[in-house]
């Protein structure tokens, strides 16, 4: 396990889009934009059950999440590790992310296939952090 530097945590706590990369069954990479939160050193992502990233992680738990500071392209963090999928508390997690990213108390798109949620908890195994120019 790797720990996140405080400066990297500060960046990851900002409501900025991040990119999550998972491994498809054929070995190719799947990249998608996500919202992130932190729980200690764990990176928290939330998705709808059945999405490609959730299916990919059930088959191969390796994942990498990157975030770039839009004000400084040389200020970024990448956290790579192993994901655990958690359904308990997933609705509260997406609501907390919606509060941070959208400024609303509840996630407004929870309908149809977006209804069932899963939290992706990423335990860092490798952290790359660039403090900026």
Sequence positions of predicted segments:
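Short, surface-exposed beta-strand-loop junctions and turns on beta-sheet-rich folds
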Residues: 51-53, 72
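Extreme N-terminal tail/first-helix region
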Residues: 1-17
């Amino acid at each position: 396990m790797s720990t996140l530097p405080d400066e990297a945590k500060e960046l990851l706590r900002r409501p900025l889009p991040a990119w999550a990369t998972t491994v498809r069954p054929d070995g190719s990479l799947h990249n998608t934009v996500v919202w992130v939160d932190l729980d200690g050193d764990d990176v928290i992502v939330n998705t709808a059950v059945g999405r490609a990233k959730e299916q990919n992680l059930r088959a191969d738990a390796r994942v990498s999440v990157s975030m770039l500071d839009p004000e400084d392209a040389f200020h970024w963090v990448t956290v790579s590790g192993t994901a655990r999928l958690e359904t308990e508390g997933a609705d509260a997690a997406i609501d907390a992310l919606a509060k941070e990213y959208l400024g609303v108390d509840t996630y407004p798109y929870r309908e149809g296939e977006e209804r069932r949620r899963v939290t992706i908890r990423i335990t860092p195994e490798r952290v790359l952090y660039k403090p900026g120019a």
